[in-house]
């Protein structure tokens, strides 16, 4: 399989730059004349009164051009898909905190030190507000669409968040683990059968055991992630229905398309695309319509299947939400948004973890031995290392509800502060030898390898931390543990695999992972 890394020539780069500048100027003009600004797009005053400024350390500011700001610099660095690398370079230039107006429209403060990142969460307020994808915000406005927890604000968010905290994060969650293990075992057993079939036919030249290359790995992990959430919501028994299996196959495809269409709108102003009715917007809009409609239909069908089975239901989130007096419409909103959020984040977190493990054969052996003794310290360390090096959300954002003092710096009310997780996780002042995968660094007594544990915050902290982190961690633990115990894994990619940003951090090329039966 041939792998190619795209290397655009100077003419193509120049044309792309001119296109983006034209889009930016036209977009700003249309925004002023025809559209109200998005409600969360804020422009805080950055010039402080002299008496106030004298008390604080000034925040370095990246200078940009009128109208387009630092857009030219971003495009020269590879565009929006390389934003995490671009900001990483800025931190090396300006330090752990700086201010930049990206693209000439959004003023933001970027922070990368562990202490500053913790400070942001201490100032997030009772109802933390985070940046939302412009395309999704516009869609919700245009369609008067009520969405799940990710899009809620204020008292409505806090009420539903407290309910889900009790059900997904706190207390005895063994009922949930049963569903995760069942779905993971089903997928890994299928890999085991295919691997055994490949190993039964040795290579003619050398007689070595033939390996099995996992086909369509990204799609398989997407399907697994969505299946896990469906089982947690309704119980494993619903998967016995062929119609639900077929619906989940189709739902997986369209959820994946939402991710792809959202990614394209990262590099083009969604409001401009909507005004001009461009295909890039029409495709996104139609796809979101379909996802919301199909997600609601799956819920209705799962409920009917459970009623028809006339037997005690599996322990499931749906019944727990009902017992908490959550309305049926709200349950649908929560479920669909959980699936959309977990589809890509869990799938790509799992890909990165498998990739990291495939490069470490000795670590695979150690994990297999650890699993045989029912120990899990090394596995926990591997998961932390994978999330540190490959955070699927390389930035976490908060709008500060009040003026705040952060590490001797003054941050104005309503400023968007972005935590640079990609930079923080690879900072040698936080982690010794940060580019290496060293699971032992997280074991008790190995603190010399971890200078600042809060340099890695893949799920954020505070009131608005990731509601699905317990599910995601258990999925990773189950998947990696089973794979390490049953397979010898290797990476077949001949070219180096790097990360690019498409809503979340993804490999810049298709991962080619091969399995052989573990013989030790």
Swiss-Prot record:
Keywords: Heme, Iron, Membrane, Metal-binding, Mitochondrion, Monooxygenase, Oxidoreductase, Transit peptide. GO terms for biological process: central nervous system development; dorsal closure; ecdysone biosynthetic process; head involution; midgut development; motor neuron axon guidance. Its cofactor is heme. Its EC number is 1.14.15.-. Pathway: Steroid biosynthesis; ecdysteroid biosynthesis. It comes from the Eukaryota. Gene3D superfamilies: Cytochrome P450 (1.10.630.10). It catalyses: 2-deoxyecdysone + 2 reduced [adrenodoxin] + O2 + 2 H(+) = ecdysone + 2 oxidized [adrenodoxin] + H2O; 2,22-dideoxyecdysone + 2 reduced [adrenodoxin] + O2 + 2 H(+) = 22-deoxyecdysone + 2 oxidized [adrenodoxin] + H2O. InterPro entries: CYP11_CYP27_families, Cyt_P450, Cyt_P450_E_grp-I, Cyt_P450_sf. It is found in: Mitochondrion membrane. Required for CNS development: midline glial cells. Involved in the metabolism of insect hormones: responsible for ecdysteroid C2-hydroxylase activity. May be involved in the breakdown of synthetic insecticides. Member of the Halloween gene group. This is Cytochrome P450 315a1, mitochondrial. The gene is sad.
């Amino acid at each position: 399989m041939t792998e190619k890394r795209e290397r655009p020539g100077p003419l193509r780069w120049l044309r792309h730059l001119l296109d983006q500048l034209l889009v930016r100027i036209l977009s700003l003009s249309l925004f002023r004349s025809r559209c109200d600004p998005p409600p969360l797009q804020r422009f805080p005053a950055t010039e402080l009164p002299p008496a106030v400024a004298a008390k604080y350390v000034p925040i370095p500011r990246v200078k940009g051009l009128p109208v387009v700001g630092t857009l030219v610099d971003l495009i020269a660095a590879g565009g929006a898909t390389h934003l995490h690398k671009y900001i990483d370079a800025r931190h090396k230039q300006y330090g752990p905190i700086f201010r930049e107006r990206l693209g000439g429209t959004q003023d933001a403060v970027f922070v990368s030190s562990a202490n500053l990142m913790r400070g942001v969460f201490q100032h997030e307020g009772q109802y933390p507000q985070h940046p939302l994808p412009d395309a999704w915000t516009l869609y919700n406005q245009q369609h008067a669409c009520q969405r799940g927890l990710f899009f809620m604000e204020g008292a409505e968010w806090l009420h539903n968040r407290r309910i889900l905290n009790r059900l997904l994060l706190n207390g005895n969650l063994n009922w949930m683990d049963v569903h995760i293990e069942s779905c993971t075992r089903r997928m890994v057993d299928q890999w085991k059968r295919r691997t055994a079939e490949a190993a039964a036919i040795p290579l003619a030249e050398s007689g070595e055991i033939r390996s099995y290359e996992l086909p369509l790995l990204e799609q398989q992990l997407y399907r697994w992630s969505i299946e896990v959430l469906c089982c947690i919501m309704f119980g494993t028994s619903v998967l016995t229905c062929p119609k639900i299996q077929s619906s989940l196959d189709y739902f997986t495809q369209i959820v994946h398309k939402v991710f792809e269409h959202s990614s394209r709108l990262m590099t083009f102003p969604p409001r401009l695309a909507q005004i001009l009715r461009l295909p890039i917007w029409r495709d996104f809009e139609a796809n979101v319509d379909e996802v919301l409609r199909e997600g609601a239909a799956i819920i209705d069908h799962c409920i009917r299947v459970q009623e028809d089975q006339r037997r005690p239901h599996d322990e499931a989130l749906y019944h727990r939400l009902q017992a908490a007096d959550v309305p049926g419409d709200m349950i649908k909103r929560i479920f669909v948004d959980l699936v959309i959020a977990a589809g890509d984040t869990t799938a790509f977190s799992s890909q990165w973890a498998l990739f990291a493990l495939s490069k470490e054969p000795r670590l695979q052996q150690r994990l297999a031995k650890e699993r045989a003794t029912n120990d899990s310290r090394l596995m926990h360390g591997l998961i932390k290392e994978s999330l540190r090096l490959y955070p699927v959300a390389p930035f976490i954002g908060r709008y500060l509800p009040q003026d705040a003092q952060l590490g001797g710096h003054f941050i104005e009310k309503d400023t968007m502060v972005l935590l640079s997780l990609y930079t923080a996780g690879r900072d040698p002042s936080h982690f010794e030898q940060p580019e290496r995968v060293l699971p032992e660094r997280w074991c008790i007594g190995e603190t010399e390898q971890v200078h600042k544990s809060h340099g890695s915050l893949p799920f954020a902290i505070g009131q608005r931390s990731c509601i699905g982190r317990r599910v995601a961690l258990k999925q990773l633990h189950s998947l990696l543990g089973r794979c390490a115990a049953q397979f010898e894994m290797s990476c077949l990619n001949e070219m180096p695999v790097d990360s690019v940003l498409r809503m979340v951090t993804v490999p810049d090329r298709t991962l080619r992972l091969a399995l052989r039966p573990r013989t030790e």
